[in-house]
């Protein structure tokens, strides 16, 4: 069974409870120091989520094989303060957008994350920042407007929205699940929200895995 050379995996099964380093490779990613939101999903919780029974699980096992391994990975995010006016009421909200492609759902904070909400760690499983500031700000504005409209605030004017980057080191954790011998495709669990993500999240991580 081959594992991706750049991922540190947790193998499924009682005999592999300690995270194992993937097969040695000359191009293994170096450790990097990051600050990340504390995960709300433990390794055992992630295993239960990925292994939950049901028709979809049966079909997936038939198509891909059984769950073999999981890996916790970290995605960099850019944090913005988004200001806008609704009538006479001023609103200020804090949204984070992934700094890889800007394709993941926005994550909203009630306020700027404080030091006690973040942990510092060293990991090989951190995606790089590839989204520049201009592209990040443009995508944030578009996504924030769309989200606000979806929440029923149709009278908001585009010109009333301003976005301000809050420069902090911020990552969020995700669990990836690999089935059978397939290391190119994965399922994704958001370790903050505790939910299984859809196709766009899988595509983001699969692109990183194949790079």
Region locations from a protein language model:
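Charged, low-complexity helical/coil segments in non-catalytic cytosolic or luminal regions
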Residues: 2-184, 201-211
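Hydrophobic "anchor" residues
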Residues: 195-196
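Short, acidic, Ser/Thr-enriched surface-loop or helix-capping motifs
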Residues: 190-191
